[in-house]
Amino acid sequence: ELGCGILPASERICASEPACKDSAANLAASGNDAAKSQNFAASQNFISQNSEEASNSVVASNYDEARNSAAMPQKILLEYISANPTGPLHIGHVRGAVYGDTFARIGGYLGHRVDTEYYINDAGNQIELLGTSIALRARELAGEDVSYPEKYYRGEYIDEIIPLARAQFGDEIFRDESRVLILAEFAKDEVLKIIQKDLADAGIHIQNWASEKSLYGELEPTIRKLERSGKMYEAEGKIWIRSSQLGDEKDRVVIREDARPTYLAGDIVYHNNKFERGYERCINIWGADHHGYIARLKAAVHFLGYDESRLEIILMQMVNLLKDGQTYKMSKRAGNAILMSDVLAAIGRDAMRFIFISKKGETPLEFDVDELAREDSSNPIFYINYAHARVNQIFAKAGKREADVLGADFGALDEAGLGLAFAALGLNEILNDAFNSRGLQKLPDFLKALAADFHKYYNENRVVGSENEDAKLKLFALVALSIRTAFALMGLSAKEKM
């Protein structure tokens, strides 16, 4: 659950409402500074009208109240991460993982149903190779000379699985080639435990884990469904799909000459299953290197009789992690990658989640872990948390609680105060925009701008002992509420003290 600080749907205020559309445009043009004098009256009227609802949210709000409140709620299946269960998650998976979890949180908050799913690729040759890699490594550790295949899995996680397999099956499992698939299945389950732990450590909890192997019973009826579309044909002993008719560079093989399904066949079955479950929209988050795969899958969805526009692919570009300006050291645990657990250990959950949605997904992301340790305005997480902590500090100095100032009139604020209130009240508009445009970086951008506006106002205005103390404290409570709400939707915790 997201906890306190979430505005109920009925009490969310957005700057796109008719009463304040013109004022919002002018405020945006002035960089969220004080409203121009010609807009002062309109801004004051808007904030006065909505201040009671917004301020009540400070002390009376929870996540469940926000559900089923969208004007046109969508039923969405969000599939993300879906890494092969052959090793721990690495930095290439982190960006999509953080984006997906944040997207699901925002969608649920806005009133949509966003179900999350991880597709386990457990039917391919890579699972058998995992078993072979473990068997060979176990024999090597026992002093045998072994010959590894050209491609195999290595790293400390392999060594960690070996004693677990030995305890379950005995040493003979590593020498009996007829049991390599049994070893592989065991290892796959152990790797999934590692993946689930890493995700939990990052605050990410997938609702459903869909096994490729479990869907194999749907292969034959799905292929028959495709054949009825007239878009399948046989050539060279293989069964092909005419994906080139819908934008793919060539037709694709679905069933090999030995009757084994291709990877594409498994994906077609899976996506037919998704739409049969009644989802209006299916969203997949993929690495940018899968861009060429989109056309063939959309073609298959179309041939299955679904509107292919209901399948949406969001691509995530690569991440380059630095330390002291140099490429971050690879992990021994995975052999040749920077692990998700490495990133968590280096910068912590909050910093990781913030940074990994701080840029558009289609833009490459590069950052230095040392910059996130700085305690100044160059570190956005510190700067935003400092704003939230300052609010708590000034309430303590005034000897008051947020609930004590809810009755204060925002109409007593000057133009600068109204400008800050207007900025804080813009959160819901930002959330809708970020969700609908898929540009989640708009949320950290909003927080950075709000924190800058707050610190400027804080430094230029006396609060405790001033004529309009309660109105200013109520304004600060609203800013803190917006920060807490946004942080909760990003999977972060706002600091009370710093």
Where are these regions (language model features)?
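Non-catalytic interaction-recognition regions
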Residues: 13, 71-498
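Short, ligand-facing micro-motifs at secondary-structure edges
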Residues: 8
